[in-house]
Amino acid sequence: MPRRRVAAKREVLDDPKYGSQILAKFMNHVMESGKKAVAERIVYGALEKVKERKNSDPLEIFEKALDAIAPLVEVKSRRVGGATYQVPVEVRPSRRNALAMRWLVDFARKRGEKSMALRLAGELMDAAEGKGAAVKKREDVHRMAEANKAFSHYRF
């Protein structure tokens, strides 16, 4: 246990273009090696591509994609008398968003398009339509939780 007080949560400032706090947080997930300007260029470029292809509000599609990716339950390992059980637990709202953003960025990086902005745009549009690798990951996590429902009485 730490001897000090728990550090206060810092507020993330809204992003300058769309005024969205969740988009600003997403940019921090895209950012590598502290290069925020590069991350902004990638995210705004991806949202422009989405706007071009879908002819609708890109922020709306972004939020729809995050909802499609965010998991409701996950499994955590719990050791009971020499055996390790995968115990399904509900995901806190803040963790839901964090996982959704992380998966979105990870699977966008693995795509085959030329630039990161194109990859991110592709993954966003796929996720908003309920397909894509990030949505598959969510379904896999839900399937694992469903399969281990019998161990849910080992709550944390």
From Swiss-Prot:
Q: Which GO terms describe its cellular component?
A: small ribosomal subunit
SUPFAM superfamilies named in the record: Ribosomal protein S7
Q: InterPro entries, per this entry?
A: Ribosomal_uS7 (IPR000235), Ribosomal_uS7_bac/org-type (IPR005717), Ribosomal_uS7_CS (IPR020606), Ribosomal_uS7_dom (IPR023798), Ribosomal_uS7_dom_sf (IPR036823)
In terms of Gene3D superfamilies, this protein maps to: Ribosomal protein S7 domain
Tell me which UniProt keywords the record has, alphabetically. Ribonucleoprotein, Ribosomal protein, RNA-binding, rRNA-binding, tRNA-binding
Q: Name one Pfam family in it.
A: Ribosomal_S7
Its BP terms in the Gene Ontology are: translation
Molecular-function annotations in GO: rRNA binding; structural constituent of ribosome; tRNA binding
Superkingdom of this entry's organism? Answer: Bacteria
**Quaternary structure annotation from Swiss-Prot or TrEMBL:** Part of the 30S ribosomal subunit. Contacts proteins S9 and S11.
Q: What does this protein do?
A: One of the primary rRNA binding proteins, it binds directly to 16S rRNA where it nucleates assembly of the head domain of the 30S subunit. Is located at the subunit interface close to the decoding center, probably blocks exit of the E-site tRNA.
Q: Member of which family?
A: Belongs to the universal ribosomal protein uS7 family.
> Mind telling me what this protein is named?
Small ribosomal subunit protein uS7
- The organism is Pseudomonas syringae pv. tomato (strain ATCC BAA-871 / DC3000)
Organism classification: Bacteria, Pseudomonadati, Pseudomonadota, Gammaproteobacteria, Pseudomonadales
